[in-house]
Amino acid sequence: MATTAAYDEIADWYEHEFLGATDTGHADPLGLGDLITELLGEGTGTCLEIGCGTGVHTARVRALGRTPVGVDLSAGMLGHARARLPVARADAERLPFRDGSLPAVLAVMVHTDMPGYPAVLREVARVLSPGGVFVHIGVHPCFCGGFADRSDPERIVVRPGYLDGHRTTDSWTDQGLRDKVGATHRPLPELLHAFLDAGLTPERFAESGGATPLVLATRARSAAGTAPGTGTAPGTGTAPGRR
């Protein structure tokens, strides 16, 4: 997560202007909350959110019966998150949890902030209990990236570049995150192979965010586990202390 300093600098803007309100009241035009409900599902025990930011998804996770905890590299973002959930400042490539200790892990709109996302997925597989569930919700690699101009709501202009892994701060708007902190693009096969290489088995997919979707979501499981579709898994996690 190489964008720590950038997020520290924009944490207040992100909380008060980009989100526009608290985790219980902000608009959700991309349908992220519904995706969390659909793919994470009801369950018990700890749910770790990687790259939790200001903790905007905390209420949704709690409503599913789970106990949210979060990690992020940005101290500025965690300054807002602490009022919502227990947090720790940590690198997602070195999670402060024991092997096989967590029944659920969640990552929402963060993989483009993590150039080492395959390493993050390996850490997810390490900390998940057998059959544990991982929900990835992220920018759709086919329709959103430096190669896709979405400035006209009626059409998307796609330029060459989809097949090239790249990082960019180019953006069609100055109201979003990309022009402030940048974004890393991975083609869809590379992203899905990273799940498989980490030992995570995708079992469900969803898209949201418009007729040409902005968001691709995946539910995957670690090896050996519960019946698909239950949304629960054995094991309990140990939450990090607040910092």
Q: Predicted regions span which residues?
A:
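Conserved class I S-adenosyl-L-methionine
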Residues: 1-43, 56-60, 77-80, 133-172, ...
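Class I SAM-dependent methyltransferase SAM/SAH-binding core
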Residues: 48-94
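A short acidic, Gly/Pro-enriched loop at the edge of an enzyme's catalytic core
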Residues: 93-105
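A short SAM/SAH-binding and catalytic strip from SAM-dependent methyltransferases
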Residues: 103-118
